[in-house]
């Protein structure tokens, strides 16, 4: 059935036309995430993989607001100093013999102020966009990024991120006595060009999330995505599917038990009203390959011109991006 509390925020042609060519710098995504939180969003799931560091960017807030103010203050101060000096020389308040000495003092002072302004510009005009995005992720609170279930990265930073994820984000409350999940994972992995393993988002981002899951999708022979594996085993723990991960955090099952063609969420919160505190076992039926079969609604997934007619409510990400410009005006 349809749920009105799910919103798709689309990076669509309209947004790219207005904001600029994709990929965008991560400060843009960070600002959008902040706006989504302010608009009442409770959980944000990114299906974008951040597997490598982003580029340092220009601190637009500083350029727009603080820099003009700082520059104006220094400019007014220097011009006032020069004007006072010129007036004093003109009316004789400063004897001519002292003009060279005072001129040197003035030059030294101006150099000092310009040097300070230069240091301030250098220190503020550039921004670590990954750090800024990480702060936005933490501000939103319930943000979910990706853990690819293939070993794509093998550098030192990737190894650290993998270990952190293994210690903090994977699920250990899965009971699979017949190792069905692992066998099904192997069947899915047979055509992969990468080794078995995990590749999470970069450490500086993944450390700030509420959770993470795998975005890997599998397409049926007719080109339709209708089957989704829910769990992937990794070194005795489990990575949840990207959207399944926040669902698990909301439902908070005591255990997940895999039996034949079922995944049982034992003693989970009632999905109809998790806040009620009522708990019961939930049974998720699976197909012969251990995947969830999506029961698509008989309507288009997304309708560009009339989002209300799609399977889920959707908006262009530009609607959130434009809030900054509207607020400034």
List the predicted regions and their residue ranges.
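Non-transmembrane functional regions of envelope-associated proteins
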Residues: 1-302, 328-329
């Amino acid at each position: 059935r349809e749920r009105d509390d799910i919103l798709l925020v689309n990076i669509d042609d309209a947004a790219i036309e207005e904001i600029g060519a994709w990929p965008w710098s991560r400060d843009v995504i960070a600002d959008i995430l902040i706006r989504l939180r302010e608009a009442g969003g409770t959980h944000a799931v990114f299906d974008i993989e951040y597997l490598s560091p982003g580029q340092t960017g220009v601190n637009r807030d500083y350029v727009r607001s603080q820099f003009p103010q700082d520059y104006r203050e220094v400019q007014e101060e220097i011009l006032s100093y020069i004007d006072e000096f010129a007036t004093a020389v003109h009316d004789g308040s400063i004897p001519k013999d002292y003009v060279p000495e005072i001129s040197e003092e003035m030059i030294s002072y101006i150099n000092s102020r310009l040097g300070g302004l230069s240091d301030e510009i250098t220190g503020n005009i550039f921004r670590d966009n990954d750090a800024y995005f990480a702060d936005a992720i933490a501000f939103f609170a319930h943000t979910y990024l990706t853990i690819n279930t293939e070993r794509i990265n093998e550098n030192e930073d990737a190894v650290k991120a993998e270990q952190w994820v293994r210690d903090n984000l994977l699920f250990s409350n899965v009971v699979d006595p017949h190792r069905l999940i692992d066998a099904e994972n192997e069947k899915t992995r047979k055509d992969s060009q990468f080794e078995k393993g995990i590749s999470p988002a970069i450490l500086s981002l993944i450390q700030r999330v509420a959770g993470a899951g795998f975005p890997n999708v599998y397409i049926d022979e007719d080109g339709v995505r209708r089957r989704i594996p829910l769990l992937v085993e990794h070194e005795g723990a489990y990575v949840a599917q990207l959207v399944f991960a926040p669902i698990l955090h909301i439902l908070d099952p005591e255990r997940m038990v895999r039996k034949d063609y079922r995944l049982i969420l034992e003693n989970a919160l009632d999905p109809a009203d998790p806040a009620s505190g009522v708990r019961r076992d939930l049974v998720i039926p699976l197909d012969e390959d251990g995947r969830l079969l999506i029961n698509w609604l008989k309507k288009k997934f997304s309708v560009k011109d009339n989002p209300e007619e799609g399977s889920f409510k959707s908006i262009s990400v530009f609607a959130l991006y434009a809030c900054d410009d509207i607020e400034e005006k």
